[in-house]
Amino acid sequence: MNKDQAEKYQERSLRQKYNLLHVLPTLNSRALSGLYYKNFHNSVKRYQIMLPEQLKSGKFCSHCGCVYVPNFNASLQLTTNTEQGDSDELGGESMEGPKKCIQVNCLNCEKSKLFEWKSEFVVPTFGQDVSPMINSTSSGKVSYAVKKPQKSKTSTGKERSKKRKLNSLTNLLSKRNQEKKMEKKKSSSLSLESFMKS
Protein backbone atom coordinates (compact mmCIF):
# COMPACT_ATOMS: atom_id res chain seq x y z
CA MET A 1 0.00 0.00 0.00
CA ASN A 2 1.48 3.37 -0.95
CA LYS A 3 1.17 6.54 1.13
CA ASP A 4 -1.97 7.84 -0.61
CA GLN A 5 -3.76 4.52 -0.26
CA ALA A 6 -2.79 4.32 3.41
CA GLU A 7 -4.17 7.82 4.05
CA LYS A 8 -7.41 6.99 2.23
CA TYR A 9 -7.78 3.78 4.22
CA GLN A 10 -7.09 5.62 7.47
CA GLU A 11 -9.64 8.31 6.63
CA ARG A 12 -12.25 5.77 5.54
CA SER A 13 -11.88 3.60 8.64
CA LEU A 14 -11.99 6.56 11.05
CA ARG A 15 -15.00 8.05 9.28
CA GLN A 16 -16.80 4.68 9.43
CA LYS A 17 -16.09 4.28 13.16
CA TYR A 18 -17.20 7.85 13.83
CA ASN A 19 -20.43 7.37 11.87
CA LEU A 20 -21.14 4.07 13.64
CA LEU A 21 -20.83 5.85 16.99
CA HIS A 22 -23.72 8.06 15.90
CA VAL A 23 -25.86 5.16 14.66
CA LEU A 24 -25.42 2.98 17.76
CA PRO A 25 -27.77 4.92 20.09
CA THR A 26 -30.70 3.63 18.03
CA LEU A 27 -29.72 0.04 18.90
CA ASN A 28 -29.80 0.68 22.69
CA SER A 29 -26.72 -1.48 23.19
CA ARG A 30 -24.45 -0.14 25.94
CA ALA A 31 -21.73 -2.72 25.43
CA LEU A 32 -21.56 -2.19 21.68
CA SER A 33 -21.41 1.60 21.94
CA GLY A 34 -18.66 1.33 24.58
CA LEU A 35 -16.70 -1.05 22.36
CA TYR A 36 -16.91 1.23 19.31
CA TYR A 37 -16.10 4.29 21.44
CA LYS A 38 -12.95 2.59 22.74
CA ASN A 39 -12.05 1.35 19.24
CA PHE A 40 -12.46 4.87 17.79
CA HIS A 41 -10.23 6.44 20.44
CA ASN A 42 -7.60 3.72 20.08
CA SER A 43 -7.50 4.40 16.33
CA VAL A 44 -7.16 8.12 16.97
CA LYS A 45 -4.21 7.46 19.27
CA ARG A 46 -2.62 5.01 16.83
CA TYR A 47 -2.78 7.50 13.96
CA GLN A 48 -1.72 10.36 16.29
CA ILE A 49 -4.68 12.55 15.40
CA MET A 50 -5.68 15.60 17.42
CA LEU A 51 -9.44 15.70 17.95
CA PRO A 52 -11.27 19.02 18.35
CA GLU A 53 -12.32 19.93 21.89
CA GLN A 54 -16.01 19.36 21.02
CA LEU A 55 -15.31 15.67 20.43
CA LYS A 56 -13.10 15.23 23.47
CA SER A 57 -15.22 16.73 26.20
CA GLY A 58 -18.96 16.70 25.84
CA LYS A 59 -20.23 14.66 22.95
CA PHE A 60 -19.81 11.13 24.32
CA CYS A 61 -20.53 9.61 27.73
CA SER A 62 -17.18 8.91 29.36
CA HIS A 63 -18.58 5.83 31.17
CA CYS A 64 -20.49 3.88 28.52
CA GLY A 65 -19.28 5.59 25.32
CA CYS A 66 -22.65 6.44 23.79
CA VAL A 67 -23.36 9.71 22.01
CA TYR A 68 -25.50 12.07 24.08
CA VAL A 69 -28.84 12.46 22.33
CA PRO A 70 -31.19 14.65 24.43
CA ASN A 71 -34.56 13.06 25.27
CA PHE A 72 -33.43 9.78 23.71
CA ASN A 73 -30.53 8.48 25.78
CA ALA A 74 -29.68 11.58 27.83
CA SER A 75 -31.60 14.08 29.92
CA LEU A 76 -30.52 17.68 30.34
CA GLN A 77 -31.11 19.82 33.39
CA LEU A 78 -30.07 23.39 34.17
CA THR A 79 -28.60 23.59 37.68
CA THR A 80 -26.12 25.59 39.70
CA ASN A 81 -22.83 24.26 40.98
CA THR A 82 -23.87 24.92 44.61
CA GLU A 83 -26.91 22.64 44.24
CA GLN A 84 -24.76 19.78 43.04
CA GLY A 85 -21.63 20.38 45.11
CA ASP A 86 -19.65 19.14 42.10
CA SER A 87 -17.34 22.09 41.54
CA ASP A 88 -14.50 19.57 41.19
CA GLU A 89 -16.04 18.28 37.96
CA LEU A 90 -15.99 21.78 36.49
CA GLY A 91 -12.33 22.26 37.14
CA GLY A 92 -12.08 22.68 40.91
CA GLU A 93 -11.96 26.48 40.75
CA SER A 94 -13.19 28.51 43.68
CA MET A 95 -16.22 30.26 42.23
CA GLU A 96 -17.85 33.41 43.46
CA GLY A 97 -21.46 32.51 44.15
CA PRO A 98 -23.62 30.06 42.24
CA LYS A 99 -22.75 29.41 38.65
CA LYS A 100 -25.11 28.00 36.03
CA CYS A 101 -24.31 24.50 34.83
CA ILE A 102 -25.89 21.95 32.55
CA GLN A 103 -26.22 18.51 34.06
CA VAL A 104 -26.34 15.72 31.49
CA ASN A 105 -27.66 12.39 32.78
CA CYS A 106 -26.89 9.40 30.59
CA LEU A 107 -29.96 7.16 30.55
CA ASN A 108 -27.89 4.11 29.54
CA CYS A 109 -25.48 4.01 32.47
CA GLU A 110 -27.26 6.45 34.86
CA LYS A 111 -24.09 8.57 35.24
CA SER A 112 -24.23 12.35 35.20
CA LYS A 113 -21.76 15.00 34.13
CA LEU A 114 -21.72 18.76 34.63
CA PHE A 115 -20.86 21.24 31.91
CA GLU A 116 -20.31 24.95 32.38
CA TRP A 117 -23.10 27.13 31.00
CA LYS A 118 -21.90 29.45 28.27
CA SER A 119 -24.34 32.27 27.75
CA GLU A 120 -22.74 33.74 24.64
CA PHE A 121 -23.32 32.05 21.33
CA VAL A 122 -20.10 30.95 19.68
CA VAL A 123 -20.18 30.82 15.91
CA PRO A 124 -17.56 28.46 14.50
CA THR A 125 -15.70 29.66 11.44
CA PHE A 126 -15.64 27.02 8.75
CA GLY A 127 -14.16 26.97 5.29
CA GLN A 128 -16.22 26.59 2.17
CA ASP A 129 -16.80 22.90 2.70
CA VAL A 130 -17.55 21.77 6.25
CA SER A 131 -15.89 18.44 6.93
CA PRO A 132 -15.78 17.93 10.68
CA MET A 133 -14.06 14.57 10.54
CA ILE A 134 -10.84 14.32 8.60
CA ASN A 135 -8.92 16.66 6.37
CA SER A 136 -7.55 14.85 3.38
CA THR A 137 -4.19 16.57 3.67
CA SER A 138 -0.96 14.68 3.88
CA SER A 139 -0.87 14.96 7.66
CA GLY A 140 -4.23 13.18 7.99
CA LYS A 141 -5.21 15.15 11.09
CA VAL A 142 -8.80 15.27 12.32
CA SER A 143 -9.98 18.83 12.64
CA TYR A 144 -12.65 21.23 11.53
CA ALA A 145 -12.10 22.73 8.13
CA VAL A 146 -10.86 26.31 8.46
CA LYS A 147 -10.22 28.86 5.77
CA LYS A 148 -6.53 28.97 5.05
CA PRO A 149 -4.79 32.17 4.01
CA GLN A 150 -4.59 32.42 0.26
CA LYS A 151 -1.17 31.83 -1.22
CA SER A 152 0.26 33.87 -4.04
CA LYS A 153 -1.27 32.91 -7.36
CA THR A 154 0.63 30.21 -9.14
CA SER A 155 0.30 29.86 -12.88
CA THR A 156 -1.80 26.95 -13.99
CA GLY A 157 -1.16 24.78 -17.00
CA LYS A 158 -3.73 26.70 -19.01
CA GLU A 159 -2.02 30.02 -18.33
CA ARG A 160 1.39 28.60 -19.17
CA SER A 161 0.13 27.25 -22.51
CA LYS A 162 -1.31 30.69 -23.36
CA LYS A 163 2.05 32.29 -22.62
CA ARG A 164 3.79 29.74 -24.84
CA LYS A 165 1.40 30.47 -27.70
CA LEU A 166 1.87 34.21 -27.31
CA ASN A 167 5.63 33.85 -27.31
CA SER A 168 5.79 31.70 -30.42
CA LEU A 169 7.78 33.04 -33.39
CA THR A 170 4.77 33.73 -35.61
CA ASN A 171 3.00 35.67 -32.89
CA LEU A 172 6.12 37.71 -32.15
CA LEU A 173 6.49 38.57 -35.86
CA SER A 174 2.84 39.52 -36.21
CA LYS A 175 3.10 41.78 -33.13
CA ARG A 176 6.18 43.44 -34.60
CA ASN A 177 4.41 44.02 -37.93
CA GLN A 178 1.40 45.53 -36.15
CA GLU A 179 3.68 47.86 -34.19
CA LYS A 180 5.34 48.99 -37.43
CA LYS A 181 1.95 49.69 -39.01
CA MET A 182 0.91 51.71 -35.97
CA GLU A 183 4.13 53.73 -36.16
CA LYS A 184 3.52 54.47 -39.85
CA LYS A 185 0.00 55.65 -39.10
CA LYS A 186 1.28 57.87 -36.30
CA SER A 187 4.11 59.23 -38.41
CA SER A 188 1.75 60.04 -41.29
CA SER A 189 -0.64 61.81 -38.96
CA LEU A 190 2.23 63.75 -37.42
CA SER A 191 3.47 64.86 -40.79
CA LEU A 192 -0.02 66.04 -41.70
CA GLU A 193 -0.21 68.06 -38.50
CA SER A 194 3.19 69.54 -39.12
CA PHE A 195 2.08 70.42 -42.65
CA MET A 196 -1.02 72.19 -41.36
CA LYS A 197 0.98 74.20 -38.86
CA SER A 198 3.35 75.49 -41.47
Curated annotation (Swiss-Prot):
Originating species:
Saccharomyces cerevisiae (strain ATCC 204508 / S288c)
Location of region: Disordered: 141-198
Q: What is this protein called?
A: Ribonuclease MRP protein subunit SNM1
Q: Which UniProt keywords apply?
A: Hydrolase, Nuclease, Nucleus, RNA-binding, rRNA processing
According to the UniProt entry, the coiled-coil residues are none
Q: How does it assemble?
A: Component of RNase MRP complex which consists of an RNA moiety and at least 10 protein subunits including POP1, POP3, POP4, POP5, POP6, POP7, POP8, RMP1, RPP1 and SNM1, many of which are shared with the RNase P complex.
Composition bias of kind Low complexity appears in 188-198
Q: Which domain of life is it from?
A: Eukaryota
Q: Name one GO biological process term.
A: rRNA processing
What are this entry's molecular-function GO terms?
A: nuclease activity; rRNA primary transcript binding
State whether keyword rRNA processing applies. yes
User: What more does the entry say?
Assistant: Present with 172 molecules/cell in log phase SD medium.
Provide the Gene Ontology terms for cellular component: nucleolar ribonuclease P complex; ribonuclease MRP complex
Explain the purpose of this protein.
Essential component of the MRP ribonucleoprotein endoribonuclease that cleaves mitochondrial primer RNA sequences.
Q: Which compartment or compartments is the protein found in?
A: Nucleus
* Bias kind Basic and acidic residues: ranges: 176-186
